[in-house]
Amino acid sequence: MKRVFLWLIFVLAFHKLLAEKIGDIASVVGVRDNQLIGYGLVIGLNGTGDKSGSKFTMQSISNMLESVNVKISADDIKSKNVAAVMITASLPPFARQGDKIDIHISSIGDAKSIQGGTLVMTPLNAVDGNIYALAQGAITSGNSNNLLSANIINGATIEREVSYDLFHKNAMVLSLKSPNFKNAIQVQNTLNKVFGNKVAIALDPKTIQITRPERFSMVEFLALVQEIPINYSAKNKIIVDEKSGTIISGVDIMVHPIVVTSQDITLKITKEPLNNSKNTQDLDNNMSLDTAHNTLSSNGKNITIAGVVKALQKIGVSAKGMVSILQALKKSGAISAEMEIL
């Protein structure tokens, strides 16, 4: 025990030098949310509910009234104060009976608005068909511009628990959020240094099996494991939103020298120094831009995505134009980092 905590004190002292805790980069297999769904009615709408042409809504009203001993045909119901909705929620791990969870409500008929209404008691089912929660509550307008969907904080009560016996387990599996051979081995080696050999073994680039030391319960063991810092190797990645023109990337992602043309813009990227002229502008990190010839120079240093984006802004390229140029750089091989298009 003493050896374990001495090691933890050592690694925590250097936490600023280490990128992540194990709990930030890996989840415990089996400890997860479960999705719930239900069909219900929102009542009390001021004429903004489903029209009588929404037959499933009228039939649902008829069924609801019949459950309280009021019998009426769906064809005779003309109300516009009720809307049919779908309710979704996430059941968190280890949720107990009586706990409250948030719910999301969405109209599925032709209602104009469900704001100001009340969701009547609706069972929420999981994929196994069992009822795990009951949802009910008033819908407030909030700040949303969407009148056909809403959230109710603590809008459902847990009625059935998902049983999971963590306490008596001897072994668990960690799953890295992003598969990486190096990170899997780092987790394995770090845990074995802290708790002793053969506590952890990497099964593949995403999965590490861990065995509980006898001196700890599984809850204690996982609590310690999740707090241990680790040298985390993250993939270089560029995220591009084509619709908004938003670009997200690491500042140190490299771009190889190249000439790229997209639409009516041509940009030359080079490491060669530029001749000083009135058209040459100094950018950050010793980079220079010749605005007359659209030439970006790193003056012998590595060129980064951040520098390219700044140069394109100086030239006056639109956000969507930047997206097109980055895509062209990726296709040409000038960017080796992974690119995700949203």
Curated annotation (Swiss-Prot):
GO biological process, one term: bacterial-type flagellum-dependent cell motility
The keyword Cytoplasm is annotated on this UniProt entry: no
Signal sequence segment: 1-19
Record key words, sorted: Bacterial flagellum, Periplasm, Signal
Molecular functions per Gene Ontology: structural molecule activity
Presence of keyword Nucleotide-binding: no
Any one GO CC term of the record: outer membrane-bounded periplasmic space
Subcellular localization(s) per the UniProt record: Periplasm; Bacterial flagellum basal body
Pfam families recorded: FlgI
Chief location of this protein within or outside the cell: periplasm
Function noted in UniProt: Assembles around the rod to form the L-ring and probably protects the motor/basal body from shearing forces during rotation.
Family stated for the protein in its record: Belongs to the FlgI family.
Subunit structure: The basal body constitutes a major portion of the flagellar organelle and consists of four rings (L,P,S, and M) mounted on a central rod.
PANTHER family named in the record: FLAGELLAR P-RING PERIPLASMIC PROTEIN FLGI (PTHR30381), FLAGELLAR P-RING PROTEIN (PTHR30381:SF0)
The name this protein goes by in its record: Flagellar P-ring protein
Organism listed in the record: Helicobacter pylori (strain P12)
This protein's encoding gene: flgI
